[in-house]
Amino acid sequence: MISLFDMFKVGIGPSSSHTVGPMKAGKQFVDDLVEKGLLDNVTRVAVDVYGSLSLTGKGHHTDIAIIMGLAGNEPATVDIDSIPGFIRDVETRGRLLLAQGRHEVDFPKDDGMRFHNGNLPLHENGMQIHAWHDDTVIYSKTYYSIGGGFIVDEEHFGQEATNEVTVPYPFKSAKEMLEYCNSTGLSLSGMVMQNELALHSKKEIEEYFGHVWQTIQACIDRGMNTEGVLPGPLRVPRRASALRRMLVSSDKLSSDPMNVIDWVNMFALAVNEENAAGGRVVTAPTNGACGIVPAVLAYYDHFIESVSPDIYTRYFLAAGAIGALYKMNASISGAEVGCQGEVGVACSMAAAGLAELLGASPEQVCVAAEIGMEHNLGLTCDPVAGQVQVPCIERNAIASVKAINAARMAMRRTSAPRVSLDKVIETMYETGKDMNAKYRETSRGGLAIKVQCD
């Protein structure tokens, strides 16, 4: 059973699969060296990056993330402001301090990080890390970053965890999830809470979701108060701060019945601009789609009622349960199934979370989730210049509004839906697997080859 602590992870931008996952892989590799007593024998480290990680790795800061992981950092706690200086030092000296400064090794600028266009056999996002003693490899590991900041090594790819804790309601489909809700009389969030209580204490759950909400609020606040241009060759101007000023200062806008949409857009833009700048964000379920779940909860907070611990906990539980279904039965990796697995899943999650807060039945929550995905089927992932900016940032805003609409449509429906959530999840996965690789986070097709950098 996937814990919702894993669905909502605090990390850094711009990508969960290409930044958060690779940093975790680097950290895991150096932890292995320490555990096996090999660290002091290492004289050089080399990294090979494959597939989508390679093709869009520079724009997604994959190389930087791996280096910071090897240095002993974790995405949730790394000092973001220290990263540029640390990377400059590594590039200048060709030396890398491993494991929080415990041991220094060679890391040549031209040979320490090698990018390969081909894929490794098990997934589109693959990397190999090698530790050398002089001319001999003394430890090597292959990792796959499978979306949402999740990583798995080659030996455990496709395997279920052997030490899983038994939960009271071990659902693997929406059908099973609804059966548990109907047999117990629990709401969706209430049922999922019982599963989480088998994995974590009540205090741990309260503290974790409190930290997630605080991180989201801080991210929105930074994003809507920061001006300038986002990093990279596109030089995309930040828009959230200007939109906020317009909304706050204009009397004409305040009387516009569509005003709420502008606020939702602003919340989403704020989060995704922070992500694009390498800021602190929450995977929901990925970084590329990290603005949607926050924007919809911020909408509820500003236009329906102030968000309390009970409200954000119920929201995250319902949204996270839907995200877990996609993770278990399909994919949340843009490199595997296109943007429908990122923005599509986030839209589905946010629609479900909002419906839960609005008093929807478990069946209506699943209808909202289904609508949120159905109208994102086939969505491609074609980041311009390999960066999580165009079309990603604006796409989060559009999907946030779509999620709110999906929740409202689900709750006002009087007829039985013809498409189930399980069927739309199955369809999304099959559609993604049929999708040409040009449209799965390789920057080899779509907008990525039509939009030129200055």
Residue ranges: model-predicted function:
Residues S17-V34, P294-S306, A351-G359:
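Alpha-helical support elements that line or immediately flank enzyme active sites
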Residues M1, I12-L55, L122, V152:
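Accessory carbohydrate-recognition regions in carbohydrate-active enzymes
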Residues R44-G57, D89-L97, Y315-M328, E370-P383, ...:
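Short, mixed-charge aromatic SLiMs
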Residues H200-G338, G446-D454:
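Accessory "access/gating" subregions that flank catalytic or transport cores
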Residues F8-G26, A277-V296, V337-C347:
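Conserved phosphate/anionic-ligand binding catalytic regions in large, soluble enzymes, centered on
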Residues V307, A318, A324-A397, M409-R418:
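Hydrophobic alpha-helical bundle architecture
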Residues R418-D454:
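Extended hydrophobic packing segments that form well-structured cores
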Residues P75-L253:
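C-terminal regulatory domains involved in ligand/effector binding and gene-expression control
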